[in-house]
Amino acid sequence: MAIKVGINGFGRIGRIVLRNALKNPEVEVVAVNDPFIDTEYAAYMFKYDSTHGRFKGKVEAKDGGLIIDGKHIQVFGERDPSNIPWGKAGADYVVESTGVFTGKEAASAHLKGGAKKVIISAPSGDAPMFVVGVNLDAYKPDMTVISNASCTTNCLAPLAKVVNDKYGIIEGLMTTVHSITATQKTVDGPSHKDWRGGRTASGNIIPSSTGAAKAVGKVIPELNGKLTGMSLRVPTVDVSVVDLTVRIKNGASYEDIKATMKAASESPELKGILGYTDEDVVSTDFIGDTHSSIFDAKAGIGLNDNFVKLISWYDNEYGYSARVVDLIVAVAKKDASA
């Protein structure tokens, strides 16, 4: 029996979560809610994607919903999450992907409509955060609202976990060179909280803040207070890259670290989550890659055996959305056996 899922917010992540879910027989998306997109437009936006290409299957708007490859998905247009009839639609697990309801209390509104569990596809200030392959052991079935953390945390955490488990991280700094996202501006415009963030996205490298490195301390408590970082927003439409520079306790050559990362990428715990490449790749080579993090063996460097720079790629849309689906499957299995 497939896990019944609803998606609130049919933006970049909502639509790509649906693309990933359609490939997974363990999951069935039964409903989508978005107050700003009518059904015809939802079908168009799902079918055509400037970054990930045209959807290969059949998409049509019919009977107040979407029919994708013969499967009917109800479409709602409620602004208030508590009014979305998830229960009537049969959706037990709801992906909260509006980017608005990221707090535990706000996301809990979905439970009033009949949802049993809410997965926030963004970092949360107070909901428990989970990174697949890193801290799923901490999940408890009585948790009703959880977060899949951020795309950058999903890239950084597996990398940091492998390094810390083998060598011990003393401290580190992270920079993510991050593609454009929907919150940025096409031309200079007002952005009162972040003045630099109001500048033209397509023509600037924009320094920005990110909580991704600090969030790793929440999913790997041993690293709490040992990592922080920043972001550089760059004019590419998709795919980002983490630069993690760390001091390690147990000295190792860069060659040894590469071997450790390769072995980890093939391990049962991280296969499909942590990737490994030793080829001369660039960012567009990773569009559509479903790994959370792809270690670039040729791009990193070591100053000495205790001070290294590690580079890891991620499709901040597709890879992250794949993990949202994986998280749903993982928690549903734990819920079923509780």
Swiss-Prot record:
BP terms from Gene Ontology: glucose metabolic process; glycolytic process
Pathway noted in the entry: Carbohydrate degradation; glycolysis; pyruvate from D-glyceraldehyde 3-phosphate: step 1/5
Main location: cytoplasm
Annotated EC: 1.2.1.12
MF-aspect GO terms: glyceraldehyde-3-phosphate dehydrogenase (NAD+) (phosphorylating) activity; NAD binding; NADP binding
Alphabetically ordered keywords of this record: Cytoplasm, Glycolysis, NAD, Oxidoreductase
Xref: InterPro entries: GlycerAld/Erythrose_P_DH, GlycerAld_3-P_DH_AS, GlycerAld_3-P_DH_cat, GlycerAld_3-P_DH_NAD(P)-bd, Glyceraldehyde-3-P_DH_1, NAD(P)-bd_dom_sf
Enzyme class: oxidoreductase
Any coiled-coil regions, as ranges: none
UniProt-annotated location(s): Cytoplasm
Site residues by UniProt (Activates thiol group during catalysis): H178
Similarity remark: Belongs to the glyceraldehyde-3-phosphate dehydrogenase family.
UniProt name for this protein: Glyceraldehyde-3-phosphate dehydrogenase
